[in-house]
Each structure stands twice: as structure tokens, then as C-alpha cells.
Amino acid sequence: MSRVATTAALNLAKSLRDAGIRDEAVLQAVANTPRELFLDAALGHKAYENTALPIGMGQTISQPYIVARMTELLLEHKPKKVLEIGTGSGYQAAILAQLSPELCTVERIKSLQIQARQRLKRLDLHNISFKYGDGWKGWPNKGPFDAIMVTAAAATVPEALLGQLVDNGVLIIPVGDTSQQLLKVVRHGEQFSSEVVEIVRFVPLVNGELA
């Protein structure tokens, strides 16, 4: 990163700490990650603002606070193998890949997946597996997973994702239509407990693939 970007990323991490993010590893990952890399050049000047921004195809790069909060919730379970549903710009994947030994990420929009792969390669992150496909189905051949993060809002919690969690594994997912709740779902054998974390707003999790 340039000196200006490095300072901006550090300031963003500080603002997230002030907003309540406590995990120092998460804050360090935010400080280390050039968010402008995941945006069109025209939006580069907004890269370190704590706001969601458009990335094309009706999708967004999530607000940094939400990226950090969801990551913090996931890391409480010390996962070694993580599944991300909705690669999008690749920014959330960049944060996760710095904090877990193995990341698998699924994206249904081919053009976004191609761009994300190129960006993450530039960051020299090599512990990521990519899949172009329907996020509702997860990635059964790669599972089970210690943790799953969904970066789009589902109308209901997808059964396929629950089935791909290990025992004591955690699913972090926004659920709802116009009114959405961020849920933390934990597997206990064949049972699941669910906790509402906070109110959020995400683009919808859509079935199928889009070239």
C-alpha cells in the first residue's frame, strides 16, 4: 500500500476499535488490507470510509464494521477451515484468509469471481480455494467446515449449509428480507442453537449461477 493508503487503513482500524471491535487480529487484518484494491478507481477515495459501496452487478462491498464484526464472531470458534458464501469483491475473503489456515469461497457471478481471484493473487494469499456456483448449496466436496460465513441475506437459513458444519461449528449469516438480522448459529450434534447478534442490511442471497 502507499503511505497514504496505509495511514487510511490504520485510521479505519482505529475507528472500528472505537466502534466496538475488540479482536486485535481482526483489526490488524483490516489495517493490512488495501480496500481500494477491491473497488473501481472512481470509488477509491471512499475506500477507507466505514460504508458499503457498489461493486457492480447489483452487489456491494460490505461496510468495514460489518466485515470486522462477522469475522470477530467467526474467530471466537478458532476455525481452521472456513467457507465463505459470496466472494463478491474479495475484500472479506482477504480478511478471512489472513486469519484462518484454509478458506473456501463460493461466488455465483462469474465476472466478480474472476476479479476477486486476480485481486487476492496480488495480495499473495495462497490459502484460498475458489468455486463458481450456487451459494445456497455450499461446497459439500470441500466440507465439513469449522465455520461458514454468508455475505448476503437469505430468506431462511439454508439447510445445506447447516449440514456442512462440523459439530460445534458456527454459521454467521444475515437472515430476512427488508428487515434483516445477523445470526450466529452453532451446531450441537443434530441440533442447532441460534443467537441474534444485531440488525443488518445486505443484498439478497440468490439461488443459481450467473455468467
From Swiss-Prot:
GO terms for molecular function: protein-L-isoaspartate (D-aspartate) O-methyltransferase activity. Its EC number is 2.1.1.77. It catalyses: [protein]-L-isoaspartate + S-adenosyl-L-methionine = [protein]-L-isoaspartate alpha-methyl ester + S-adenosyl-L-homocysteine. The active site is at S62. GO terms for cellular component: cytoplasm. PROSITE patterns: PCMT. It comes from the Bacteria. HAMAP family: PIMT (MF_00090). PANTHER family: PROTEIN-L-ISOASPARTATE O-METHYLTRANSFERASE (PTHR11579), PROTEIN-L-ISOASPARTATE(D-ASPARTATE) O-METHYLTRANSFERASE (PTHR11579:SF0). NCBIfam families: pimt (TIGR00080), PRK00312.1 (NF001453). This is Protein-L-isoaspartate O-methyltransferase. It comes from Shewanella woodyi (strain ATCC 51908 / MS32). The lineage of its organism: Bacteria, Pseudomonadati, Pseudomonadota, Gammaproteobacteria, Alteromonadales.
